[in-house]
Structures are given as structure tokens and as C-alpha cells.
Design a protein with these regions (language model features):
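Alpha-helical propensity feature that highlights long, continuous alpha-helices across diverse contexts
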Residues: 1-78
């Protein structure tokens, strides 16, 4: 689903920017002391397990939007 994938990528990018602002950097293994995290890569380079985590967050967000009574309608092509 295009919207789920777009939201999942955004979720990851927002998370990564937050970590970077907190001083975290990429590292092959998570290291709290050195503030290294293997997930600090572009979304496209994540493995499917990590992408699925972000997709789950995106789906949860879409469910909340629907529960609140909103609908998402794509733009019509001109």
C-alpha cells in the first residue's frame, strides 16, 4: 500500500532525525554508551523486520485517523 509505505518511511526518518539530534550516530551494533545504532540508515536500507515495525506504526496511525472519523482521499489527476 502506497500510503502505508510512505508513512512508514516518514516514521523512520522522523525517528532517525530525533536520534541524530540527540547525538546518536550509525554503528553496526546498538551501543548506548557510544550512542550508536544500526537503524540510523535510510529507510530503503533497513531490513524487512525493521520496515515492518515502521509499517505497523503507520497502520496504527491510519487506524486512529479513521477512528476519529477522517478519510484519506487521493488527489484526482488533472
Amino acid at each position: 500500500n502506497v500510503i502505508v509505505e510512505a508513512l512508514a518511511e516518514n516514521v523512520h526518518e522522523v525517528w532517525a532525525q530525533s536520534r541524530i539530534q540527540q547525538g546518536w550516530v550509525y554503528g553496526p551494533e546498538r551501543n548506548e554508551k557510544l550512542k550508536q545504532h544500526p537503524g540510523l540508515v535510510p529507510y530503503a536500507k533497513l531490513d524487512e523486520v525493521e520496515k515492518d515495525y515502521d509499517r505497523h506504526t503507520a497502520i496504527s496511525t491510519l487506524k486512529l485517523i479513521t477512528k476519529l472519523g477522517f478519510t484519506i482521499v487521493p488527489k484526482e489527476n488533472p
